[in-house]
Amino acid sequence: MEVVLHEGDAKDWVYKGEGAANLILSYTGSSPSMLGKVLRVKKILKDKGQPAPNCIVFSSHEEHLWGKIPGLLESVKNDCLPQAYATIVMSQHLGANHVDGGVRVRVSKNFFELAGKNVLDNRPAWRVNASAIDAGADSALLISDHTLFSGNPRGSSCIAVEIKAKCGFLPSSEYISKENSIKKQVTRYKMHQHLKFHLGEISKTSEYDPLDLFSGSKERIHMAIKSFFSTPQNNFRIFVDGSLVFGGMGGGADSVHPNETEKCLEDLSKVTGLQLSDFIELLSEAIFKSGVLGKLLATQKLDDHDIEGAIHLYYNIISQPCLVCKSITDTELLRKYSTLHSLPLDKSEKIVRDFLISATAKDCSLMISFRPRQSGTTDSEYDSVFLDSVNQSYDYKAYFIDLDVKPLDKMVHYFKLDQKIVNFYTRNGEVGGDPRDPPKGCGPR
């Protein structure tokens, strides 16, 4: 940790965005070592004064769960778990060339307090009410700003797209109860959308179907990307030269007004010369050619027991009576779950570890950035795609972001949320429609 950010440096960092656990600051100063960088800083929950819900310190059970992975426990002691988990664990599954762990930098007293005040007016009100920068922290994670290219040629615009793809497959686990068999036919994303609509968290259910994006079919990838423009929510954001031009800043955006979509498309067209159809083709081609979603899907599929199976192994790990089994009356299901409870500890840990890695993969985002390739360039460090409609080649890079380890004790939350989502959809079907109607476009294809 050689780099130190001092109080006077706070003015050079501006608001870029935030999620539940971290806030992102973008550098606007003149230091060559900081240009093209963002700072990922921890937040605390205002009502509890506790760190936001991510895993920064391991419990004794987590130490045993993750202890066999070299370097991971040591990273907790050095306060660099997010960096280590991304580079040691997730890069094995997603590819080291698509994972940027960043570097830990020290921060002097008052830096975060000043930075927090400076960005206050830029943060969504609901985020401000819920959380704040952890002013007591003494370090942060410095990462490349993947909405930009390093050393971008003069006059060349960079377009970056952030996609939170969510779970891209339908589970087939034998541990899913008959009452919840709808999970094998309808995507978790779609079912959750209807619960969110019912709770008033969104004003319109999304048209996006993760199965389209992960299908490997160019036509269906086109459909998925097109759907983002009418209902981006927190799944889709576009940046031009590092500045957000479409989508929400705080990860909680609802629908975008049609006028905003039109303005975004006008801005895109002005700086890139691309019409919407060109842009969708460019993004689709890069997703298809890079193969990154194939790696993401394979990582998500490490969850082969579903939460309805994995929750029982969680109770094995914490050596507590299974609270789920207490409420089950189905004899056949109890027999299956008894088999899980008889597994040795190392097998239970392997299944839960894979489940948590999968949970990170289901919740992370993919950042794909583009810039026009200079004519005559043959030795670029980046891959490229050629867009026939504008007769232009584009450099592109793809990185996964938000690769934090999920806390072990969140297993109970995952189970309860899963049951809540499925129970609501089973009772109500598609909100606003006839629950007896078959789900539209969500069954196996």
From Swiss-Prot:
<feature type="binding site">
    <location>
        <position position="40"/>
    </location>
    <ligand>
        <name>ATP</name>
    </ligand>
</feature>
<dbReference type="GO" id="GO:0035299">
    <property type="term" value="F:inositol-1,3,4,5,6-pentakisphosphate 2-kinase activity"/>
</dbReference>
<feature type="binding site">
    <location>
        <position position="325"/>
    </location>
    <ligand>
        <name>Zn(2+)</name>
    </ligand>
</feature>
<feature type="binding site">
    <location>
        <position position="127"/>
    </location>
    <ligand>
        <name>substrate</name>
    </ligand>
</feature>
<keyword id="KW-0067">ATP-binding</keyword>
<comment type="similarity">
    <text>Belongs to the IPK1 type 2 family.</text>
</comment>
<keyword id="KW-0808">Transferase</keyword>
<feature type="binding site">
    <location>
        <position position="234"/>
    </location>
    <ligand>
        <name>substrate</name>
    </ligand>
</feature>
<protein>
    <recommendedName>
        <fullName>Inositol-pentakisphosphate 2-kinase IPK1</fullName>
        <ecNumber>2.7.1.158</ecNumber>
    </recommendedName>
</protein>
<feature type="binding site">
    <location>
        <position position="363"/>
    </location>
    <ligand>
        <name>substrate</name>
    </ligand>
</feature>
<feature type="binding site">
    <location>
        <position position="196"/>
    </location>
    <ligand>
        <name>substrate</name>
    </ligand>
</feature>
<dbReference type="GO" id="GO:0005524">
    <property type="term" value="F:ATP binding"/>
</dbReference>
<dbReference type="GO" id="GO:0032958">
    <property type="term" value="P:inositol phosphate biosynthetic process"/>
</dbReference>
<feature type="binding site">
    <location>
        <position position="406"/>
    </location>
    <ligand>
        <name>substrate</name>
    </ligand>
</feature>
<feature type="binding site">
    <location>
        <position position="414"/>
    </location>
    <ligand>
        <name>substrate</name>
    </ligand>
</feature>
<feature type="binding site">
    <location>
        <position position="410"/>
    </location>
    <ligand>
        <name>substrate</name>
    </ligand>
</feature>
<dbReference type="InterPro" id="IPR009286">
    <property type="entry name" value="Ins_P5_2-kin"/>
</dbReference>
<feature type="binding site">
    <location>
        <position position="341"/>
    </location>
    <ligand>
        <name>Zn(2+)</name>
    </ligand>
</feature>
<keyword id="KW-0547">Nucleotide-binding</keyword>
<dbReference type="GO" id="GO:0005634">
    <property type="term" value="C:nucleus"/>
</dbReference>
<feature type="binding site">
    <location>
        <begin position="19"/>
        <end position="22"/>
    </location>
    <ligand>
        <name>ATP</name>
    </ligand>
</feature>
<feature type="binding site">
    <location>
        <position position="402"/>
    </location>
    <ligand>
        <name>ATP</name>
    </ligand>
</feature>
<dbReference type="InterPro" id="IPR043001">
    <property type="entry name" value="IP5_2-K_N_lobe"/>
</dbReference>
<keyword id="KW-0479">Metal-binding</keyword>
<dbReference type="Pfam" id="PF06090">
    <property type="entry name" value="Ins_P5_2-kin"/>
</dbReference>
<feature type="short sequence motif" description="EXKPK motif">
    <location>
        <begin position="162"/>
        <end position="166"/>
    </location>
</feature>
<dbReference type="GO" id="GO:0046872">
    <property type="term" value="F:metal ion binding"/>
</dbReference>
<feature type="binding site">
    <location>
        <position position="322"/>
    </location>
    <ligand>
        <name>Zn(2+)</name>
    </ligand>
</feature>
<keyword id="KW-0862">Zinc</keyword>
<feature type="binding site">
    <location>
        <position position="166"/>
    </location>
    <ligand>
        <name>substrate</name>
    </ligand>
</feature>
<feature type="binding site">
    <location>
        <position position="237"/>
    </location>
    <ligand>
        <name>ATP</name>
    </ligand>
</feature>
<feature type="binding site">
    <location>
        <begin position="144"/>
        <end position="146"/>
    </location>
    <ligand>
        <name>ATP</name>
    </ligand>
</feature>
<feature type="binding site">
    <location>
        <begin position="162"/>
        <end position="164"/>
    </location>
    <ligand>
        <name>ATP</name>
    </ligand>
</feature>
<feature type="binding site">
    <location>
        <position position="312"/>
    </location>
    <ligand>
        <name>Zn(2+)</name>
    </ligand>
</feature>
<keyword id="KW-0418">Kinase</keyword>
<comment type="function">
    <text>Phosphorylates Ins(1,3,4,5,6)P5 at position 2 to form Ins(1,2,3,4,5,6)P6 (InsP6 or phytate). Phytate is a regulator of intracellular signaling, a highly abundant animal antinutrient, and a phosphate store in plant seeds. Also phosphorylates Ins(1,3,4,6)P4 and Ins(1,4,5,6)P4 to produce Ins(1,2,3,4,6)P5 and Ins(1,2,4,5,6)P5.</text>
</comment>
